[in-house]
From Swiss-Prot:
InterPro entries, sorted: PSI_Ycf4_assembly
UniProt source species: Lepidium virginicum (Virginia pepperweed)
Any Pfam family hit: Ycf4
Designated name of the protein: Photosystem I assembly protein Ycf4
Gene coding for it: ycf4
Transmembrane segments: 22-42, 57-77
GO cellular component: chloroplast thylakoid membrane; photosystem I
Subcellular location: Plastid, Chloroplast thylakoid membrane
Family: Belongs to the Ycf4 family.
Chief location bin: plastid
Gene Ontology BP term (one): photosynthesis
Length: 184
């Protein structure tokens, strides 16, 4: 999603609050909870939940392994829910031609670097770079090449843009910033 005027372009970044992250966190939570309950049932020797008969699973080694997988899955699920709650990775890219400044803001994990704020002069932008790797694990990334800073990614690698959409976005941004496009 973006907003544009004659001299300002704001590109809003989604971050971790995407439908796929909600689905994975929910599925992982339910699956790991099931594993932990089956492991606990095998330890106690009685059914904690009626779906899985505990007599079929002995505690050593199957019950221990299932309990371990359940606990590990709950930790990973907790991590996913925290990234969703904190909306890690969301933010905006602001390009202001009137002031000649580019501002990039992202939310990070809580702590010292919770707010990631980068500011550059437009005259320091060398180019807009497109990196396209086709194949099984296709990767399409849009970078902004800054003099003395290197390349800064503007579009996340997990966003499923087609090559045409990336090229269109790069062309529009390069035209707005009045810089060349490089393709790798």
């Amino acid at each position: 999603m973006s907003w544009r005027s004659e001299s300002i372009w704001i590109e809003f970044i989604t971050g971790s609050r995407k439908t796929s992250n909600f689905c994975w966190a929910f599925i992982l939570f339910l699956g790991s909870l099931g594993f932990l309950l089956v492991g606990t049932s095998s330890y106690l020797g009685r059914n904690v939940i009626s779906l899985f008969p505990s007599q079929q699973i002995i505690f050593f080694p199957q019950g221990i392994v299932m309990s371990f997988y359940g606990i590990a899955g709950l930790f990973i699920s907790c991590y996913l829910w925290c990234t969703i709650l904190w909306n890690v990775g969301s933010g905006y890219d602001l390009f202001d031609r009137k002031e000649g400044i580019v501002r990039i803001f992202r939310w990070g994990f809580p702590g010292k670097s919770r707010r990631i704020f980068l500011r550059f002069l437009m005259k320091d932008i060398q180019s807009i770079r497109i990196e396209v790797k086709e194949g099984v694990s296709a990767r399409r990334v849009l970078y902004m090449e800054i003099r003395g800073q290197g390349a800064i990614p503007l579009i996340r690698t997990d966003e499923n843009f087609t090559t045409r959409e990336i090229e269109q976005k790069a062309a529009e941004l390069a035209y707005f910033l009045r810089v060349p496009i490089e393709v790798f």
